[in-house]
């Protein structure tokens, strides 16, 4: 019995959000003694204020996140979570033309796959409930990480329980506890205390950026009959060039909406209630008063915080065998690809695959051998994951431009149509849109970028070939028989010749 206890590792997880909670489930399933420390109170308590100071943020759960949750081997958990989601099969673009409101659907995937809108609290509560039922997991809320020694494997937490009196003769300091561990996982968000203390030991390259965009949350209420006011199976976008308004469905038949705009535009909107209403009418047609009344719009804009958007990159994601950081603590990304949550959950799957591969959970190994194996696993994780998280960071920035402007351009629609047609009709090519690769596969993010660039070069070659061939065919026909072809006949002949060229080119690619 003593030998069994000796072989168990002790893991400290900092942060009880979805990513930290999933990490705890993975470790507990492998026999670790797990302790989770969370700065805030119990996240299942509605009175607990989230770190972003809002209470109803919706998340997009796609293939990467679902796969990571399935690998926890808690089928009931993932099934319960998915039952509470709303599938979104594509974007619904809104606009106005000559005074008439219009909307146009753009499917995410030619095969009908969808991403899932899920309430943050629904996901987090399900994970925490599962952890509470796991015997080798302990939850500690209202605990702030104040220090760590990653050579001695010790950490210190202040216990900030509401109503708890300071200890006698403590100069009113809150109680502090010392915790020993074998390794720590830092999953405490973009302003991570775990990362801060790790940087005292590791040489971390760190890049943080605030883009000139603020966001504010709004709500479209259900109809008087308790139904959705607009299609629930789409992510609704009102693109506005420099800004945009989006809406995601919620389980209570409302929509959680977000206004993204530069700080200067927020200042203009806040200068008078009339500016806010008029701006929405001009730039986001059909929102006010059709979906949100002017009074509600003004109240929500005044009440809800106007928050910045942060992105960060860092390397490495670990120090020796003592600590590894995951999720936003390692790679906060902008929300415009819906991959922040999914990338964080995928971190956990990839991390524990490396831990398993390198023998960190080999119970026959000595503690020193397991530490050495864990150090190798952490290094392999950093080597792979830094490249991928930097890639999704860049993709998320690029997608902001696409969402607020590109979705309406003919070039975007043309490329999307061509790529989807190739995916549907010539599957042997392995052709997919970049969005499908990101959202509906587990392909590494860095490889997604490489695939998208290759496809872009092929499409560019195809376009150039088409233009050159068109000119060549027309010149040939006029040179051979300048008077024997009507314009209609010339076009039909040119189309047959060009079609044969395209078929030949893609057949060559398919069988290469």
From Swiss-Prot:
SUPFAM superfamilies: FAD/NAD(P)-binding domain. GO terms for molecular function: FAD binding; kynurenine 3-monooxygenase activity. It holds the Pfam family FAD_binding_3. It catalyses: L-kynurenine + NADPH + O2 + H(+) = 3-hydroxy-L-kynurenine + NADP(+) + H2O. Its main location: mitochondrion. Keywords: FAD, Flavoprotein, Membrane, Mitochondrion, Mitochondrion outer membrane, Monooxygenase, NADP, Oxidoreductase, Pyridine nucleotide biosynthesis. Its cofactor is FAD. Its EC number is 1.14.13.9. The keyword 4Fe-4S does not apply. Pathway: Cofactor biosynthesis; NAD(+) biosynthesis; quinolinate from L-kynurenine: step 1/3. It is an enzyme of class 1 (oxidoreductase). Catalyzes the hydroxylation of L-kynurenine (L-Kyn) to form 3-hydroxy-L-kynurenine (L-3OHKyn). Required for synthesis of quinolinic acid. Belongs to the aromatic-ring hydroxylase family. KMO subfamily. This is Kynurenine 3-monooxygenase. The gene is bna4.
